[in-house]
Swiss-Prot record:
It comes from Gluconacetobacter diazotrophicus (strain ATCC 49037 / DSM 5601 / CCUG 37298 / CIP 103539 / LMG 7603 / PAl5). One of its GO terms (molecular function) is S-adenosylmethionine:tRNA ribosyltransferase-isomerase activity. Belongs to the QueA family. GO terms for cellular component: cytoplasm. Transmembrane segments: none annotated. Pathway: tRNA modification; tRNA-queuosine biosynthesis. The gene is queA. This is S-adenosylmethionine:tRNA ribosyltransferase-isomerase. One of its GO terms (biological process) is tRNA wobble guanine modification. Monomer. Its EC number is 2.4.99.17. Transfers and isomerizes the ribose moiety from AdoMet to the 7-aminomethyl group of 7-deazaguanine (preQ1-tRNA) to give epoxyqueuosine (oQ-tRNA). Keywords: Cytoplasm, Queuosine biosynthesis, S-adenosyl-L-methionine, Transferase.
Length: 355
């Protein structure tokens, strides 16, 4: 099994990087990738016909915050990207010019009366901040001072637009705290959810607050040396019960996005039973991983050399995904956060019945 990041590289024409989402959202293309046999070119609104009655869709209900902040330490300008809230109410953040910061420094934010104290700093650009406000007042501060942290491949020379605030939110959004959107969820519309209901496909949600580390590349060529950033996740007892009941009844667990899959796998017992979860996960799924919780994955098309491309190769098979991505490029599928989607059926392991 390969341990080299370069083995997960591929050529992607820049013209295939989506700058805006499909409208309506469920008109995006969907590449159906069964465990074996030919690929099928569909659209997202075909999803109900590709699933079975009794299957359970599991979506991430995190909501994106405007996480980029323009801070000052005296006259020095410090760019801050909030990453995740910590149990004590402080925030871990990534900081440009972080080496200028020391514990005890106080940051100000132009145009607001708010401040943040620097609690600590690491050697990788990370800082821990304690803001002078919390709760609804902190949310109001972010709405006034923060900017969406759109992925760097979405070109916005003058910054994210008000339309991006709408486009970069999923229909499932309920719990604020993510830096980046769980982009597979961007394809869902009220009409699509109604069609899934009519087809007998169940639905539940979990929460994984996607952190700023999602944009970080694998440095070097050794996959084994890569360390994921921790992200906060919650699976309620109600959601765990629904997933376990669906599996007992013979339904498949369909993860909407890699974030849902990663949290489900983090919360799964060896036999696939899902336990309630409330904590951090830094799970890194790559070829060789044995899946316990998820049977089908709906996800967008990911970056070369990224941990997410490694994840889908682990899920559906390395050669299978190389072929699928080659098909997608040749057929003009749109890539990344605002792009098209694919539906992956997990590659069976030895002794396992077909899914």
């Amino acid at each position: 099994m390969t341990d080299l990041a370069s083995d997960f590289d591929f050529d992607l024409p820049p013209a295939l990087i989506a700058e805006h989402p499909a409208r309506p959202r469920d008109s995006a293309r969907l590449l159906d990738i069964p465990a074996a046999g030919p690929f099928h070119d569909r659209i997202v609104r075909d999803l109900p016909s590709l699933l079975r009655p009794g299957d359970l869709l599991v979506a991430n209900d995190t909501a994106v915050i405007p996480a980029q902040l323009d801070a000052r330490r005296g006259e020095a300008r410090i760019g801050i990207t909030l990453d995740r809230i910590l149990p004590d109410g402080t925030w871990h953040a990534l900081a440009r010019n972080a080496r200028r910061l020391r514990a005890g420094d106080v940051l100000t934010f132009p145009g607001t009366p708010n401040t943040a104290a620097v609690i600590s700093r690491d050697d990788e650009g990370g800082v821990v901040l304690r803001f002078d406000t919390e709760g609804a007042a902190f949310d109001a501060f972010l709405q006034a001072a923060g900017v969406l942290a759109l992925p760097p491949y979405i070109a916005r020379p003058f910054g994210p637009t008000e339309q991006d605030r709408v486009d970069y939110a999923t229909i499932f959004s309920a719990h604020r705290g993510a830096v980046a959107a769980p982009t597979a969820g961007l394809h869902f519309t009220p009409d699509l959810l109604a069609a899934l209901d009519a087809a007998g496909v169940g639905r539940c949600t979990l929460t994984l607050h996607v952190g700023a580390g999602t944009f970080l590349p694998v440095r070097g060529d050794s996959i084994a040396a890569h360390r994921m950033h921790a992200e906060r996740g919650v699976i309620t007892a109600e959601t765990a019960d629904a997933i376990n009941a669906a599996r007992r009844a013979g339904g498949r667990i369909v993860a909407v996005g890699t974030t849902s899959l990663r949290l489900l796998e983090s919360a799964a017992d060896p036999d696939g039973t899902i336990r309630p979860f409330d904590g951090d996960t830094a799970i890194f799924i790559r070829p060789g991983y044995r899946f316990r919780a998820v049977d089908v994955l709906m996800t967008n098309f990911h970056l070369p050399r990224s941990t997410l491309f490694m994840l889908v190769c682990a899920f559906a098979g390395y050669d299978r995904m190389r072929d699928a991505y080659a098909h997608a490029v040749a057929d003009g599928y749109r890539f990344y956060s605002y792009g098209d989607a694919c539906l992956l059926h997990r590659a069976p392991v030895a002794g396992e019945q077909g899914l």
